[in-house]
Every structure is written in C-alpha cells, then in structure tokens.
Amino acid sequence: MRATGRARGARRPLRVVRRPGCPVTRPNRPVHQSIGPTSRLARVDVHPSACAVSIEIAPLAARGRRNTDPAGTPLADSAPLRQPLRSVRAHRFGIRAMTRGRAITRTSNEPSSHAGHASPKPPANHRPGRRPTSTPNRRAPAPPPSATPRETPSGRSSVWCILNRVQTDVNVMKSSRSSKSARAEAAQPEFPRLSLFDAKGKVKTVEAQALRVDFADGRSLMFDLSGSSGDAAVAIVAQHTDPSLRATIALRPEHYDSVTVEAGADENPDFAHDATDDAGEDAPNREPELDLAVQYGDEIGDAQRRSLPKRKVIAEWLEPAIFSDAQFTVRFVGADEGRTLNHSYRHKDYATNVLTFAYGEEPDGVTVADLVLCCPVVEKEAREQGKTLVAHYAHLLVHGALHAQGYDHERGEEDAAEMEALEIDILAKLGFPNPYR
C-alpha cells in the first residue's frame, strides 16, 4: 500500500536493504519494520520442534551502524544500513533539517555562518511558518556522524553540525511525544496487539492472546501470543482436523529478518497402529470371506453343465460352512477322472462322491483347498437315497468344506458325531433336511 501523506510523529516504513548473498524481499512487509524507540533492525531466531516452532524477534543493529549478520559480525563488503530520517522543520530559521540521531544537515543556498552557533539569516522571500522557495524540496543525504565540513563542487558549504536552537526545538517535540508515549505505555495491554490487514490495505487492531489460521484442506496454524515462550517470541503450532494425518511445520528463510512458515501434513503412524489394533479386535466378529472358483472336467458336456449348481448358489452353500477366510476351487468331473484321482491319492480303484484336497492355511490364515465332485456318483446316490439332486450337492459341498478345515469323521466315533451334527446344523440354516435320516 502506497502512502500519500504522513502525520507528524508517525513512523515511516522501513526500506528494504539489498544485502550480498541474500534474496531481495518485498518492500514494506510488517516483519521488516524497525522495533523500539531507537529504530533498531530486527533479527528472527527460530526454535523448531516436531510440529511446533518458536520464533523470537531480537534487535540486530543500531541506527547508523554497518550491516551485520545474524550473529552480530560486521560484514566488510556491505554498505551502511539506510534508515529512515527524522524530518524537523525549524520555522524560526526557515530551513529544513534532516536528522540522523543528533546530526543534521543545512540545505539552504546561503553559506554557513555557524561560527559561535549563530543562526543564519533567513532568505528575503521567507515568510514565517513556510518553507523558503530557494530550498530544494528533497532530502539531502546524511553522511556518517564523524563527517567534517567540506566545500562542495558548486561552491556551497555543506556543514554537518549540531545546532543548539534547532536541537532545542527537537527536544521540545520529543518532550511532547514522550508524554504521549508515557500515557500509551501506562495503558499498554497485557497481551500483544494484533493488526489485521484486508485486501485494500485497511488495518484493524485488536488485543489477542492467540491467533489461528485455518486452511480449506483442514490444516491450521495456531499462534500463541501469550508470551509464555518469552519476550517478543511467538509459539506456532501446526494442527490438522483429520486424525489420520499429522501436521508438520516447514521453515523457509527469506532474509536475515524474515522467515516463511508452511503447514504440511503426512501420514499419522499412531493412527494407523490404532486402526490395526481395532481391526484385530473386531476380527472375530467379521464375516469370513470366500474366494471361489468353479471348474468342469473334460467329461462334463454343455447340457450337463447347465443342470449343475451355479457359482453363486455354491458360494451361498459354502459360506455358512467356513469359519475363516477360505480359497476354494470346486471341480465337477466325470467317472473316469474321479476314479483316477481317487486311485492316485487314496489308492482306491473306484470313483467316490467327493474328494477334498486340503493344502492347509496360508501365512495370512486363509484356508486353501480343492473340492472334486464326481457327477455320475452324486446323481446315483441321490436316486438311491431318495434325495433331491440339489440337496445332495449341498450336503457334499458342506461335507468337503469341513474336511478342508480339519474335521474328519474317520478318526473316531466322537469326531464323526461332531462333524455330522455340524453338517445338520449348517444344512438346516440353508433350508435342507437332515441328510442322515
């Protein structure tokens, strides 16, 4: 925002200084304003942690000194810091004096007559309370305090001195301002004053203990202004509304007196661990999942295939019979393939109704098995026992699934009774009658 005027006594914005090896920052940023009554430059000290950072503002250099690094070491190749000059108009003498500390410069075209601190004679066109027309309306550059009077090429004398009467006027102005400063300090609030700027540059000042900046994606930055981190220090904490994400803080230095704070987010390992624990606690109540594949042997023609149970129906029959995640392959074969498999693995030279090839459990707890049903044998048994073909297929599939999970009716009568009772209960849930009656 460009200012068109400035009231007497108002602080002039600090100009940005280009320093070798450092990027040039944008002018008139609030972090570049001088601090304190002596207009010293500020240095930013950063104390980071996991998701928080403490930024402390400290004085860097006094007015008129050479540029220094953050450690306070003077830089040999840098130019003196250009500080804003205090403008004092001495109406009594009709001159405009530019002060840097206590040093002022005379800008009148008249030769200096400061010997004995005598006041110069005002120009002929001077009127009290106005600036003489012969005085250029620009500021003269301020030399170092140790400068001595010298003759300029134009023949004019540019004298650097301290005028008692002008200094008296300055002291009067300072005394009036000091009384206002004393009253302001007496009414100083307990917490820092927060200035908010809108898009048009208008400022609104409030007294606040904390400030939070919320972003659209759930990230936020909390600024602690209570002073608990120390004088002229602000603690900044990054937060995120999503518990699965952990807020982070990234610092990007721009200049010796400014730093950019960026809020980020990454995966929260604690949240992932808690979610895994919750999943483990809920695992017993979770329905087991079935990965089912259906195959047909070479002896099964298209007409017979259409009469066999479909994959969806087979899955509905097997789901109540599995107690953990399972990966089953159901294969319908003819008499020749059924006989070959039974002879190869059980050393029995005939085809049987169902063969179960259990491969045990995988490391992740999934039961893997193949269930082979011989269609001619199943159809023959259904006719002989007076059962429907669908009910008999359902019973044999449940029987083979229990075998795959470790149940065995051939180990003894007790194991056989347990397995039969389980089969009856599962088939009853599916709507089928007791197969052993």
Curated annotation (Swiss-Prot):
Zn(2+) binds at residues 399, 403, 409. Residues 1-172 are annotated as: Unknown. This is Endoribonuclease YbeY. Transmembrane segments: none annotated. The gene is ybeY. Keywords: Cytoplasm, Endonuclease, Hydrolase, Metal-binding, Nuclease, Ribosome biogenesis, rRNA processing, Zinc. Residues 173-437 are annotated as: Endoribonuclease YbeY. Residues 131-140 have a biased composition (Low complexity). Single strand-specific metallo-endoribonuclease involved in late-stage 70S ribosome quality control and in maturation of the 3' terminus of the 16S rRNA. Binds 1 zinc ion. Belongs to the endoribonuclease YbeY family. GO terms for molecular function: metalloendopeptidase activity; RNA endonuclease activity; zinc ion binding. It holds the Pfam family YbeY. GO terms for biological process: rRNA processing. InterPro entries: MetalPrtase_cat_dom_sf_prd, YbeY, YbeY_CS. Residues 64-158 are annotated as: Disordered. Its cofactor is Zn(2+). It is found in: Cytoplasm. One of its GO terms (cellular component) is cytoplasm. It comes from Burkholderia thailandensis (strain ATCC 700388 / DSM 13276 / CCUG 48851 / CIP 106301 / E264). Its EC number is 3.1.-.-.
